[in-house]
């Protein structure tokens, strides 16, 4: 289900552009060479329908929109950080690393239980408990 929302060829790259502050359609298109206007439009529309992005009309003639991440979209920054941490460990060279803002020490992904905040390393993925 999650991969249906963010797993296609361009969506993660578009999300990354929005996370780093690119808001304008043409700037996003320029920064992602090879991405056609119609594909970018379709991806932005799908991301808006999924609740990841909002669009704001800033010019009526011709119509131009700026794009911003919703809170749900901003929460995907953790996914990008985890990918960058993985890249630091497994890609040579890796051009990005995730570090503590104050100490500049490398960081790692840690999982905590939601209620007790206990750190855990043993994870399972199971069907969600959906309340009716």
Role assignments for model-derived ranges:
Residues 15, 23-28, 44, 72, ...:
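Extended, folded domain segments that form the structural surfaces/walls around functional sites
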Residues 26-58:
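Canonical helix-turn-helix DNA-binding module
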């Amino acid at each position: 289900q999650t991969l249906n929302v963010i797993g296609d060829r361009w969506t993660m790259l578009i999300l990354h552009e929005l996370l780093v502050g690119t808001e304008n359609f043409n700037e996003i298109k320029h920064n992602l060479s090879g991405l056609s206007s119609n594909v970018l439009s379709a991806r932005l529309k799908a991301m808006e329908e999924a609740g990841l992005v909002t669009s704001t009309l800033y010019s009526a003639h011709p119509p131009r929109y700026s794009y911003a991440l919703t809170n749900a979209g901003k929460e995907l920054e953790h996914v990008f950080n985890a990918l960058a941490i993985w890249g630091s460990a497994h890609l040579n060279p890796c051009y990005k690393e995730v570090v503590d803002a104050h100490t500049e020490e490398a960081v790692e992904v840690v999982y905590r239980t939601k209620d007790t905040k206990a750190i855990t390393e043993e994870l399972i993925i199971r069907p969600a408990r959906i309340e009716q």
